[in-house]
Amino acid sequence: MQLSVWTYEGPPHIGAMRIATAMRDVHYVLHAPQGDTYADLLFTMIERRDRRPPVTYTTFQARDLGGDTADLLQSAVRAAYERFQPQAMLVGASCTAELIQDDPGGLAQALKLPIPVIPLELPAYQRKENWGASETFYRIVRALAASSADGSPRREREAGARPVCNLLGPTALGFRHRDDLAEVTRQVVELGIEINVVAPWNATPADLARLPQAGFNIVLYPEIALTAAQWLHRQFGQPFTRTIPIGVGATRDFIAEVAALAGVDASPVLARSESRLPWYSRSVDSTYLTGKRVFIFGDATHAVAAARVATQELGFEVVGLGTYAREFAREIREAAAVYGVEPLITDDYLEVEARVGELRPELVLGTQMERHIAKRLGIPCAVISAPCHVQDFPARYSPQMGFEGANVLFDTWVHPLMMGLEEHLLGMFREDHEFADHAPSHLGAASAAPAPAPLRVVETVTSTELAWASDAERELTKIPFFVRGKARRNTERFARERNVNLITLETLYDAKAHFGR
């Protein structure tokens, strides 16, 4: 067992909750002990939903283990049906309840309720949240779509009829899923394509039964919808998209792919495409962009897309690329090979922190944890992927996909670099009389502060007793903070190799010239 203060993904039943919460007229009965009800807070506190997830917990306690927990589960299922009257019910166990092996799905089906009861077998000790969401969505689609069709191939569209598609993948607690869906919907409608079903977002079981009526499927998040889309392709002959529209180039490719599947002309939509990212990235001071070293980590979909945007549209250099989702390790390895970097496939945040510390990039694109890591290391950062915190569920419209999403990416990624330069300039000129350590105030003048202590030599003692002269230390502070650590390490390495115990201003300049060759 590995103890940790952070995990990139929760257990698979959290993924099942994301699907149930995203849908309507679905209820999830979770066989779980009293302490597993914490998951509600993910949706009400972090995502700021206005209602609790549609989940009933059996909440058995330690004393119940000596009795019949199976009867407790059946009572909870029966009560949930009578109270909420859902169109379909999901039944599963939490990671803790899995240990007592009560077979929740079988027990619920034995009640013979007049609605579909979909059992979920989610191995909590082998799989995690995204897999749980994918498996849950697949099970629901398979149970409801198969019951409404005979499995025959889809019918060809009649002449003159509008093409029809499904949008698959948006869930509760997803990174900008709400706004991505709005942006992609607008683009699909502009192509003259009718949207049959959006799932699981706001879909009902009756909606899922209509999935086979579409001509093709648009997969927005492969971590969630790829398995279901593959089954729909095998069962009903529905092709599905593979391009994720994040960034200007990928959005244009996505529109072309959707148009090809629908048999429509994409050129009018592509001609009207408006995004400020291409011009902004060409017009902005190259100091902010060109050649900036960036480290990328997140779910595979957003990480691979971010690498393409960073290199092809912003002129960054990718120095690290990784994911916590082992199910999509192949995609990350293929992308890492393109950029000539070593892929990082891990769900241990300490490994990620070590890699960031080793590479010392100028920008980190990652999850909420990479935000903390970058802050500790003094590196600019932007969040591009779940897991994320409350500030990444904004009230404003802020997609990641489509042409408007490209504008959001530019602002989100470039502004930390610009602010970093601003902080550096403030640091350089902080001794100027026009700058002060404290923010200006409209209040009356404070009492005179004591005179500052005289400057003294700051000694940084290392294993080889290195010390920094005060003038060298002051000069070091003029180096931008995001490369200051690297400059310090290189200078100390230069001094050790030459048996220099006191690093002076001359030593600092010599080291800079040595490593700048």
UniProtKB/Swiss-Prot annotation:
HAMAP family: ChlB_BchB. Binds 1 [4Fe-4S] cluster per heterodimer. The cluster is bound at the heterodimer interface by residues from both subunits. Belongs to the ChlB/BchB/BchZ family. Substrate binds at G420, L421. Pfam families: Oxidored_nitro, PCP_red. This is Light-independent protochlorophyllide reductase subunit B. Keywords: 4Fe-4S, ATP-binding, Bacteriochlorophyll biosynthesis, Chlorophyll biosynthesis, Iron, Iron-sulfur, Metal-binding, Nucleotide-binding, Oxidoreductase, Photosynthesis. Transmembrane segments: none annotated. One of its GO terms (molecular function) is oxidoreductase activity, acting on the CH-CH group of donors, iron-sulfur protein as acceptor. Component of the dark-operative protochlorophyllide reductase (DPOR) that uses Mg-ATP and reduced ferredoxin to reduce ring D of protochlorophyllide (Pchlide) to form chlorophyllide a (Chlide). This reaction is light-independent. The NB-protein (BchN-BchB) is the catalytic component of the complex. Its cofactor is [4Fe-4S] cluster. It comes from the Bacteria. The active site is at D285. One of its GO terms (biological process) is light-independent bacteriochlorophyll biosynthetic process. It is an enzyme of class 1 (oxidoreductase). Pathway: Porphyrin-containing compound metabolism; bacteriochlorophyll biosynthesis (light-independent). Gene3D superfamilies: 1.20.89.20, Nitrogenase molybdenum iron protein domain, Proto-chlorophyllide reductase 57 kD subunit B. Protochlorophyllide reductase is composed of three subunits; BchL, BchN and BchB. Forms a heterotetramer of two BchB and two BchN subunits. It catalyses: chlorophyllide a + oxidized 2[4Fe-4S]-[ferredoxin] + 2 ADP + 2 phosphate = protochlorophyllide a + reduced 2[4Fe-4S]-[ferredoxin] + 2 ATP + 2 H2O. [4Fe-4S] cluster binds at D36. InterPro entries: ChlB/BchB/BchZ (IPR050152), LI-POR_suB-like_C (IPR013580), Nase/OxRdtase_comp1 (IPR000510), P-CP_red_C (IPR042298), Protochl_reductB (IPR005969), Protochlorophyllide_Rdtase (IPR016209). It comes from Bradyrhizobium sp. (strain BTAi1 / ATCC BAA-1182).
